[in-house]
């Protein structure tokens, strides 16, 4: 495991498993034994999600310029204490330019006893000035999975970027929705009711989930002409094409 640093960027590759690495690193930072023992009070607070000086941002709670200003004030005020201060920003590549520039200043002027942890799935979308000021670690594809599924389900789960997302999909039901849609799209003998059920689910998908379905179909089809059409559909998702048109193209192969 890498040594604690004031700014760590964890670069995720497809099939990587972030959570155990993140937990091990955070406990090592705060550990009263300086080993990441996972038994001392500070380690246990990290494991139970009750560590007091820990600030977390993700897509549900995106990091913005005002957060950087507030964090800077809070972290500087609390830096006189001996307790380690942590802030985590997931999916750094999704931040606005304004937020990234504000974060850059926070990294450059980091208070003592403060540790920033960032994750990304595409480091090429991060400001070079940030990349030059952080320690980088690359997470490769996980060799072991924390769950067991059959081979057909495994193929669908691979459409999710990381093991963490696969676990979340199994837990929140999004995997079941994708499985129903994909099963219908890959079955040539559907009934009207199964097509209707798939359509109802498909039109509820967000852009990321829609891309997952399309990318699965790209891998699934052996027809090069169809592959090209699917890849064009993936690239055109940024223009928010009508869901009905996408579904019609997929169901009428």
UniProtKB/Swiss-Prot annotation:
Entry-linked SUPFAM superfamilies: P-loop containing nucleoside triphosphate hydrolases (SSF52540)
InterPro entries named in the record: P-loop_NTPase
Domain of life according to the entry: Bacteria
Protein name stated in the entry: Uncharacterized protein MG007 homolog
